[in-house]
Structures are given as C-alpha cells and as structure tokens.
Amino acid sequence: MSAHNPPRLVNLAAMSLLRDEALAIWSLEYLPMELYPPLFMAAFSLRRSETMMAMVQTWPFARLPLGGLMKKPHQETLEAVLDGLDVLLAQKVQPRKCKLRVLDLRNTGQDFWNMWSGDKYHVTSSSLMASVAKDMPRTKHPLAPLEMYVDLCLKENTWGKCITYLFTWVEQRKGSIHLCCKKMKIVSRSRETIKKVFRIVKLDCIQEVDLNFTQKLSSLAKFAPLLGKMRNVQKLLLSPIHGSSFTSQVEVTYHSGFPELITCFLSFSSRCLKIPLYNISITNCLLTELDLTHLSQSPKICQLKGLNLSGVTLTNFCPKLIQGLLEKVADTLEELNLNLCGITDPLLTALVPALSCCSQLRVFSICGNLISMAVLQSLLRHTDGLSALRLEFYPAPRESYSSLGILNQERLAQLKAELWQLLTDLGHPRKIWIKKTRILFLCLRCHLDQNLCET
C-alpha cells in the first residue's frame, strides 16, 4: 500500500478484528451492514474460513457476489461459504439479520466490492449497486430455495475439484438450491456428462447454450426434450468436435445423426420457448431441408439478430427455403455468417433480393464459397442500400484461380481494383475484406470436374 493510496480505517479495523477470529464471529450480531463487505473481503484475503462461514449466515444483503472476489476457483473458500448455506438451509425460519437469497459465483459484482472498499473510481453504476445490495423483507415462512448463479464452461476431464464439489453439493440439496446458469458451454464426448449437467442445472434459467460434442451423435437426439425445456434460451450454438483421431467414416456417421437432433430441437423450441431466439449458430453439420423448414417456420425467430450456418452445406437446397428464412428475419437480422456453405453463383443470385431487404444487417460473411466476379459485383450493388452494414467478408472471386485451383496473386490484385472502383462509383463509404481460403480449392476442383463431364 503506497503513501498515495493508504488503507482506509475501516479496512484496518477489519484486519485488526480478524486477529481474533472468535471475537470477529461473536461481533457479527452487532456489526452494522456497512461493515460486512470490508470484513468479508478481509476474511477472504486472509483465508479465514470460519469467519466467512459465519458471515454467510448473517449476510445483510440479498446477494453475495462471491465470484467477483475469486479470480480463480478456491475450494477452501467455496466450502466455507457452502457450509454457511447449509446452516441456513437447516433453519425453518430465516434469521432476523440475514437477507441472503442469491449466491453469485459468476465473474460479476466487482462494483459491489469496489464501492464498499472505497474504490469509487472503479464503480460504474449506482443502479447496479442498488440491485446487488438491495434489502429484502424478512420472511417468517419456511425458506424458499436459495438461488446460486454460475457461468459454466465444462470441458471433459478438466472440471477441477471446485466444480465437482459444487455439483455434488447442489445435487444433494436439489430441493433447497436452484443452480441457475445463464451461460453454459459444454465440450464433451460423453452423453452421461451432458445428462448430469442438465439434471443439476435449472434449465429454464439458461439464456445461452454452447454445446460441443462428438461420437455417436445420433443418440444426442434424446436430449432434444431437455433443450426444449430451456424456455428462455436466447442464443444457441450446436457444434461438432473435430479431432485428428476421427476418420472420415466416423464423421459421416456423426453428421448423419445430427439432423435428427436439430429437427427435434427446432420442433420442441417452437412449442416450449417463452421468449424469441436472438442468436442461432449451427455450424459444420449436415442439415436437411426439413430442418430449414422447421427453422424458417418457427415463431421464435421473429426477433433473430444473429444467424451462423458456417460449414453447413447449402449447395443442393431449394433456394426458396433459404430465401424464405432470410425474408422472415429481414427486419431484425444484424449478423449473417454463411462461410464454407458450398454457395455458388445460382444460389447466391437467388438470395440477393432477400439479402437486400435485411435493413439492420451490420455483419455479413460468405468466405470460402465459389463466387464469380460478376455475381460478387451484383451482390455489392444490391446491398449498397444497407446503411447499417459495417463489416463485409467475401471470398476471392473464382476468376482469381487458375484451372488447377492455384491462386493468381496478380489477377486477384486486378479484380480487387475493379471492386474498389465499383464501390467508389456507388458513392457510399464502404469497406470490404476479400479472403483467400484453401477450402476454395476443393470447391473449384469439383466445379471444374463438373464442367468437364458436361462437355
């Protein structure tokens, strides 16, 4: 602590009080609520588990943002706080002083601790303070379930002792604790892992889901009803895990089962979700026209802002299906990613009218597709009226590749100059990115082989 930033008297008092932990615990009954945060921070810093356990039982605020103090999971601290909750849960009537209803383990609440530590320069919102430290009337009825908030990013074999301990603790007290997870990411090869997480977490609290999985993916269709119970989901990402250990045969088996999961989820989501979906990301998967029909007909996409279908092969889809989907979300869509979708000139030409109606579109990317210079120029002309468009990513035009699929840098530079001139002639400030990709070589070879067969 420097001379320019001396410790506050209240912080010094908290440190002094903790020299005698028994005295500190005894004094909690008489401690003003304003002194609780500084004392808890001191107890956390000095790892005074008994004091933290006792403070949880008399916490005078509605929320304890523990995650804002723990930069990394600390099992001893977590155990102390959960032991304090156990004492609370064992009581039939809420203690007079305790107002605690929410334990927040997310990386939030820094403003709360900054305010009570006197670090006013890092307090960003007084309204946030009110919501974190809001007082609540004491109930004389049996305690309602306590809520515990956590953002989960679970990778197989990397759960760690803290998350394992937390899950076991919550599962044993499921009737008294609601584990609420607004953001969830699971990377797993195991159905049992996913099943266990879904069994413990309160599903209707989830707002963002990022599910990465592999092996025998057709069996994941069994989880579609669980996904359907996530009634407040706003952002959904379903992605495969590609590893070097997989053969192409395994990947085909994986992809063949995936549409069943998508179809089931879209069907369930249409009936079960309480609020609209704001973001959908379905990548590197094989979808059917039935899946796309379910998606375009779902009433839950009426306010969709983000759509990512990168890696989903759209080559043989009926253009009207994709066109209908874009038309339905044209008034709200802000970000559209169609990278590596096997899009060629005929399909993109059919989609241009629908794309030009996406008035809120800010980000548009179709990299890794085989598009000619003429169609790319037509697309730029038709989207010139989209005033919100800020980021545009396009593939190098097909003409910049040789007959062997080798990129001709000189030809690419010439085509870029023509595109820049087109943008200048259109008269609106606009910046686009032209990207090269190796995947395009495979698309080009298929295109050349097809032309060769036709001739």
Where in the sequence are the language-model features?
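N-terminal adaptor-interaction module of cullin-RING ubiquitin ligase components
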Residues: M1-Q215, A221
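Long amphipathic alpha-helical scaffold regions
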Residues: A62-V81, M230, K235-P240, S245-S248, ...
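Amphipathic alpha-helical interface elements that mediate macromolecular binding in regulatory proteins
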Residues: P7, N11, M33-M41, E50, ...
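C-terminal capping region of solenoid repeat domains
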Residues: S2, Q75, G84-V87, S117-V123, ...
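Extended amphipathic alpha-helical scaffold segments
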Residues: R19-V56, L321-G324, E334-G342, P346-G368
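Conserved hydrophobic beta-strand positions in leucine-rich repeat
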Residues: L64-G67, C98, L103-R106, M148, ...
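A structural signal for leucine-rich repeat
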Residues: K196-V201, A221-M230, T247-P276, L292-I301, ...
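Short, solvent-exposed loop/turn at the beta-strand->alpha-helix junction
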Residues: R19-L23, M33, R48, Q110-W113, ...
